[in-house]
Amino acid sequence: MKFPESFDVIVVGGGHAGTEAALAAARMGAKTLLLTHNIETLGAMSCNPSIGGIGKGHLVREVDALGGAMALATDEAGIQFRTLNSSKGPAVRATRAQADRVLYKAAIRQRLENQPGLTLFQQAVDDLVLDGARVVGVKTQLGILFEARAVVLTAGTFLAGLVHVGLENFQAGRMGDPPAVSLAARLRELDLPVGRLKTGTPPRIDGRTIDYSRTQVQPGDDPAPVFSFMGDRSMHPAQRPCWITHTTVATHEIIRGGLDRSPLYAGVIEGVGPRYCPSIEDKITRFADKASHQIFLEPEGLTTHEIYPNGISTSLPFDVQHAIVRSIPGLEHAHILRPGYAIEYDYYDPRNLKASLETKSIAGLFFAGQINGTTGYEEAAAQGLLAGLNAALQTQGKDAWSPGRHEAYLGVLVDDLITRGVSEPYRMFTSRAEYRLQLREDNADMRLTETGRALGVVDDARWDQFNRKRDEVARETERLKSVWVNPAILPADAATQLIGQPIEREYSLFDLLRRPNLGYAQVLALPGGGAGVADVGVAEQVEIAAKYQGYIDRQNEEVDKHREQEGLRLPPDLDYTRLTGLSMEVRQRLQTAQPETLGQASRLQGVTPAAISVLLVYAKRGFKPDEQKKSA
């Protein structure tokens, strides 16, 4: 049957990418439908019970700055918060939270159910409906046709998902959920560039059977950091510690003894796993010289005893898993509640995507999340938001939007995907960004909220809060610049006590804040320092501006130098094989990739700086007709 209503945007999948995509499209006024195989699993944390981390926390803040749900949901569900790299510079500091799975799902579902313009429907999607080279809807398992002007596909690990435990395997989207077999087959019919990847998860432990006296406790930060720019510590539920233990020589012997029954090492699994979250089998093989590997025992929630042992992801047979767990200090009598497993699934080469995350070959069809070869909740959420807002923009007849590498980690993520593709599951790190000092967690709102408001994804409450914060940062900065101290006001003894050394001339408080040994609170203790600002985020912005503005200004100059070439658009129908002055290898790589901008072209493997110079010459000449393709 044909569903009586049609939609602007349909989102397929209710994970972290799908929920952000649906919310973003609906916030922009698009009539949106979210289809999921099971409404009870909306926003489920399929693997580890944590959000954030190095690079990942930056993405969460950017999603939040654009009105997304992940950060606020984490503030409402987080049972431990920590700032990683707190002793390092602000560019690489990152927030990480342990989340209660039940509370997190509830927070996401509450937002979905109360979002105007968003409809939920429980049905697995089996088919994409096309009109020529444009998607016009989807068909579900029951044969229901839903029509739409744009479709966002966020299928996670469900496309032809295959679960492995030892040499046993069976079809599943994740343990306990059916796979999307029909949809996977339909996508393969469309001749899109498909591959296989894999990921894994560890066995879960009953915390009542753990001897915590043999582990090291790891408490959260006090005071706890807050994830959302709209958040507050009062949102946080009760806080819980984590614990640290480690593998042993005996653990490694057990693993080596079971490798002949590992699907990974027996050649049963074809997909490539994540380099930066390897299975324990991979760890002891790749790092054979290490006597032990750290394991973090992470609570799954406030109302369960279940513990997630982060660091022993495995697809070894259950009897080997049992022996592994019991060889670990503190887990000698541990009871496994759920076995670990690996899952193999289809993904599609993201080089077939535009920067908007729309597929190049099928108009109106957007991909987000693990289908694009990424790993991680945060990477999925960021892509979902971008795909959802661009799907809405397309239905409104507006130009697509994607941030540049200098504007957001989201921009780095998308550019890496569509330019370089993936050979293994992609995860975000701060090291992937060229302009880290600009792309900090603390200034994600200053970088993106104004753009989000113009796009339509930022609501009035967030916009008002953003403007209040921006104004307060400006006022406090000017106040500190206007308050002066000199040796008469601050004698040598007092100066030595307060700031570590006497001052030899007059300084503004802002000048003194530039000193590496002085923080905001210490400057307020000086004569005329006053009460300062209560908002920790405002104080942080003021202090970072004082200490790092010189470096930031230099990086801005570097960005400006590259921006003109970076954003120079290349014709979509350009026949690179007919351009002279380029090597055959470069022409072939450009012809295959069809980069949208000169910046993307410059990051293609094998494309040299000399080749970019040649393209720049052609661009200035306007790519004359005799150098272009004569027909589409």
Swiss-Prot record:
Record-linked InterPro entries: FAD/NAD-bd_sf, GIDA_C_N, MnmG, MnmG-rel, MnmG-rel_CS, MnmG_C, MnmG_C_subdom, MnmG_C_subdom_sf
Cofactor: FAD
Annotated keywords: Cytoplasm, FAD, Flavoprotein, NAD, tRNA processing
Superkingdom field: Bacteria
The keyword tRNA processing belongs to this UniProt entry's keyword annotation: yes
Cellular location(s): Cytoplasm
SUPFAM superfamilies: FAD/NAD(P)-binding domain
Gene Ontology CC annotation, any one: cytosol
Disulfide bonds: none
Annotated residues for binding of NAD(+): 273-287
Subunit structure comment from the entry: Homodimer. Heterotetramer of two MnmE and two MnmG subunits.
Cited function: NAD-binding protein involved in the addition of a carboxymethylaminomethyl (cmnm) group at the wobble position (U34) of certain tRNAs, forming tRNA-cmnm(5)s(2)U34.
Family affiliation: Belongs to the MnmG family.
Protein name as annotated: tRNA uridine 5-carboxymethylaminomethyl modification enzyme MnmG
Source organism per UniProt: Thiobacillus denitrificans (strain ATCC 25259 / T1)
